[in-house]
Amino acid sequence: MTTPVRTLVLLRHAKSEYPDGVADHERPLAPRGIREAALAGDWIRANVGKVDAVLCSTATRTRETLARTGIESDIRYEDSLYDSRPGIVVDLVNGVDEDVTTLLVVGHEPTTSSLAFALADPSSDADALMRMTQKYPTSAIAVLTTQLPWAQLELGGATLVDFHVPR
């Protein structure tokens, strides 16, 4: 029996506002972020397909980003995705059910780009890597594939196949 190709989609939250007196964790999306989160959802549906499960930070801006994408799936909100590190995210991914073939992670910088780079193996798309190196802006999407079961995914264990910035 062959292991199915699994797809990991890493979405940085959309552009947020900086209202006075609002804690960082509670910052909402800016109007531009609302628009771009919807564009991100459209792009994911058109280019990746159905998302089976989502891991999302508990921060207001990530929750609002996910809601505005219009992606309906099994969602798990994780406090540890806020102010996180790549290893923490990999640990969360390692715990995802093996029936999930496409997983979306909605998170923050610098973790999202660091994770994408750390997971990318030598066969990754050079153009996508170059664009990611230049900047991983709000609403940016990295798409990686792997033949490893989620429980075995480790750094260098996936191929970066696309990088998109919805505008």
Per-region residue spans from a language model:
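A glycine-rich beta-strand to alpha-helix segment
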Residues: V100-P122, L129
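Short, solvent-exposed aromatic-acidic interface loops
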Residues: A158-R167
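Residue-level preference for the first positions of well-ordered beta-strands
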Residues: L8, T102-L104, I141
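Domain-level recognition of soluble alpha/beta enzyme cores
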Residues: A120-T159
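Short, structured active-site "lid" loops
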Residues: S73-D74, D97-L103
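Glycine-rich phosphate-binding loop signature in dinucleotide/nucleotide-binding domains
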Residues: N47-K50, G95-V100
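Active-site-proximal alpha-helix that buttresses catalytic centers in soluble enzyme cores
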Residues: T2-I88, A120-A126, Y136, T146
